């Protein structure tokens, strides 16, 4: 595909025309769970009274576009058109689990981008990527390269054969020629070998430099795994990445190296002792390359994927830069939506990329050229036109702040991608990042694996402070005193019941199992909310929208509010993630019923811990 003439007029009008031919996908606000999109023409997201063009926009704002030369081959204009079609099967990396290769299908095609669907799973786990992504491979790649293929749910691993699967389901595999538009820095140096140790930046917590292992090597990239953590923290990078450094780099540069969980005396970590104990070798320092700093400058214009709504690409400005990253600001939007991204990310492109590839471009908010299409769902968030949903691709649109990816109630929530392999629903609580979740650190395995399933704790200190949704610290001791239950008092007036239900149920404590210290508090709430007893979070997570509404209707005094949950299409997983603010401020339910519903949610969230704790105590006896 050719690069556009710099004098050519780049307009939304041509984008819409190309979009009519190349974009396929559903237009309904709600998509059916697990449904794969069939080809259909997708309406442009905007209409224009006049033609919007980059040329005019740059001239009027006296702005400058980021030069095409600053973009890598993966970011710049593709050499070939996107030949993928809806329904084609392929293999690829799970965006949430970088170690897992899965059976994928093309659910939607838009310009040079794909929405990929995990066969056998709900569409809420779908994710977007470019057609030239190094994370996708043709059918049979895993078998050829000896990688394990994570097969569709309900299929037996020893019985799954690609050709039989395609034939039985009358499916088509994506031709190998479609996987050709890739850049490569050449093969990984032979000095890099699987199992070797190094020091690496934790991409989720960039201030941390941690002990890590080379877990896999594919073509020109390596997979970095953090010793003692699960593979959801892994990431792929090339050997020139600034995120990986040789053993001893932290000591030489005065940086703190985070030892693996469970390592004795982490403040006295010794690479010599650790390598000997793990019977491993360090990656030779000479094998590491040095990436040249990018040439991006503040105020340069470009086109960027909206990470809160990944189906959209917006007109953007570089707000700030550091050595290897740029800060993206969407023109016309509040700076609270700005975010940092690697300078070589496939989510940023030169101006005109959308026009050339046939992808819709979201023009700046407040532009006089933008008009809302008739019938488009209304959203109260300024700038949002009802496109996308905080719960990901399962819903094509929203009409309230509850589902809006940009609303204040969702601003601190991670949008779009959900981990389909993590069965246990995570409680909507955040520990202070300077503390761990548990008083018992993960048991260290010298091969870099974590023997404790709860491996998200990053430091070894005991949790003493709890933060809920980024708000003020809670005095746990005072909270527990409020929750003490007097067993002799077996009868309560209606007012007393309401008063007790208005008291929040503690989610955690300084111990790993909170209810060990306050067993009567749970007993109290079970008596006041009998419908909650013996129901675990894993069961609630499987509830449908109707089942959630039915449960809310069963709560005394909450009958009339069941329709709110049905209207917002809240299923079991979404129900478990609700906060008190969501129920009161977004769904506009009065405080009394809201607290009763929220306490039920807290009971559900903690039921699993209580059951496991009881089983553990029984085993010890």
Curated annotation (Swiss-Prot):
InterPro entries according to UniProt: Mbt (IPR004092), PcG_chromatin_remod_factors (IPR050548), SAM (IPR001660), SAM/pointed_sf (IPR013761), Znf_C2H2C (IPR002515)
Locations listed in the record: Nucleus
Main location: nucleus
Domain SAM: start-end pairs: 543-607
Ranges for region Disordered: 1-48
Positions annotated as zinc finger (CCHHC-type): 370-414
Binding annotation for Zn(2+): 379, 384, 398, 404
Single Gene Ontology BP annotation: chromatin organization
GO cellular component, one term: nucleus
Coiled coil segments of this chain: none
SUPFAM superfamilies: SAM/Pointed domain (SSF47769), Tudor/PWWP/MBT (SSF63748)
Residue ranges, compositional bias (Basic and acidic residues): 10-20, 28-44
Keywords noted in UniProt: Chromatin regulator, Metal-binding, Nucleus, Repeat, Transcription, Transcription regulation, Zinc, Zinc-finger
Keyword Transferase included in the entry's annotation: no
Residue ranges of MBT repeats: 52-152, 160-260, 269-364
SMART domains per record: MBT, SAM
Protein name, per record: Lethal(3)malignant brain tumor-like protein 4
Organism of provenance: Mus musculus
């Amino acid at each position: 595909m050719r690069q556009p003439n710099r004098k050519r007029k780049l307009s939304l009008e041509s984008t819409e025309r190309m979009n009519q031919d190349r974009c396929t996908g559903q237009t309904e606000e709600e998509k059916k769970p697990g449904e794969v999109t069939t080809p259909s023409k997708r309406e442009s997201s905007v209409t224009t009274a006049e033609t919007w063009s980059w040329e005019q926009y740059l001239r009027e704002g006296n702005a400058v576009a980021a030069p095409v030369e600053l973009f890598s081959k993966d970011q710049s204009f593709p050499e070939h058109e996107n030949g993928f079609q809806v329904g084609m099967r392929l293999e690829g990396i799970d965006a949430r689990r970088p170690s897992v290769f899965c059976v994928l299908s093309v659910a939607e095609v838009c310009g040079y981008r794909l929405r990929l669907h995990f066969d056998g799973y709900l569409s809420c786990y779908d994710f977007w990527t470019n057609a030239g992504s190094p994370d996708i491979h043709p059918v049979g790649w895993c078998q050829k390269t000896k990688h394990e293929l994570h097969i569709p749910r309900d299929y037996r691993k020893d019985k799954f054969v690609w050709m039989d699967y395609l034939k039985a389901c009358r499916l088509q595999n994506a031709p190998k020629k479609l996987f050709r538009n890739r850049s490569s820095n050449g093969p990984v140096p032979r000095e890099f070998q699987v199992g070797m140790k190094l020091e690496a930046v934790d991409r989720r917590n960039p201030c941390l430099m941690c002990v890590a292992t080379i877990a896999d090597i594919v073509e020109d990239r390596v997979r970095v795994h953090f010793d003692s953590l699960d593979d959801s923290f892994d990431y792929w990078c090339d050997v020139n990445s600034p995120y990986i450094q040789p053993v001893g780099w932290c000591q030489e540069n005065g940086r703190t190296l985070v030892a693996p969980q469970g390592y004795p005396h982490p403040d006295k970590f010794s690479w010599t002792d650790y390598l000997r104990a793990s019977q491993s070798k360090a990656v030779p320092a000479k094998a590491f390359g040095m990436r040249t700093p990018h040439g991006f400058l503040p105020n340069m214009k470009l086109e960027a994927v909206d990470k809160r709504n990944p189906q959209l690409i917006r007109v953007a400005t570089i707000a700030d830069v550091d050595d290897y990253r740029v800060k993206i600001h969407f023109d016309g939007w509040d700076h609270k939506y700005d975010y940092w991204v690697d300078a070589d990310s496939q989510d940023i492109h030169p101006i005109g990329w959308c026009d050339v590839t046939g992808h819709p471009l979201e023009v700046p908010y407040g532009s006089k050229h933008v008009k809302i299409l008739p019938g488009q769902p209304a959203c109260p968030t300024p700038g949002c036109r009802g496109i996308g949903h905080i719960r990901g691709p399962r819903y094509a649109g929203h009409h309230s702040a509850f589902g809006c990816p940009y609303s204040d109630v969702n601003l601190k929530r991670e949008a779009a991608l959900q981990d389909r392999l993590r069965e246990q629903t995570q409680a909507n609580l955040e520990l202070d990042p300077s503390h761990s979740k548990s008083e018992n650190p993960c048991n260290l395995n010298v091969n870099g694996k974590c023997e404790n399933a709860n491996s998200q704790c990053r430091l070894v200190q005991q949790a003493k402070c709890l933060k809920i949704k980024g708000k003020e610290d809670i005095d746990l001791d005072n909270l527990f005193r409020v929750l003490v239950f007097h067993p002799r008092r077996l009868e309560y007036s209606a007012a007393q019941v309401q008063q007790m239900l208005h008291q929040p149920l503690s989610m955690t404590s300084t111990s790993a199992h909170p209810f060990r210290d306050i067993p009567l508090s749970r007993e109290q709430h079970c008596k006041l909310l009998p419908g909650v007893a013996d129901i675990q979070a894993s069961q609630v997570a499987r509830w449908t929208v109707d089942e959630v509404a039915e449960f809310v209707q069963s709560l005394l005094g909450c009958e009339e509010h069941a329709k709110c949950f049905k209207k917002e299409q809240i299923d079991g997983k979404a129900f478990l993630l609700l906060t008190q603010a969501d129920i009161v401020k977004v769904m506009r339910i009065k405080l009394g019923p809201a607290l009763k519903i929220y306490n039920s949610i807290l009971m559900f969230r903690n039921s699993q811990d209580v059951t496991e704790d009881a089983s553990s105590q029984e085993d010890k006896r």
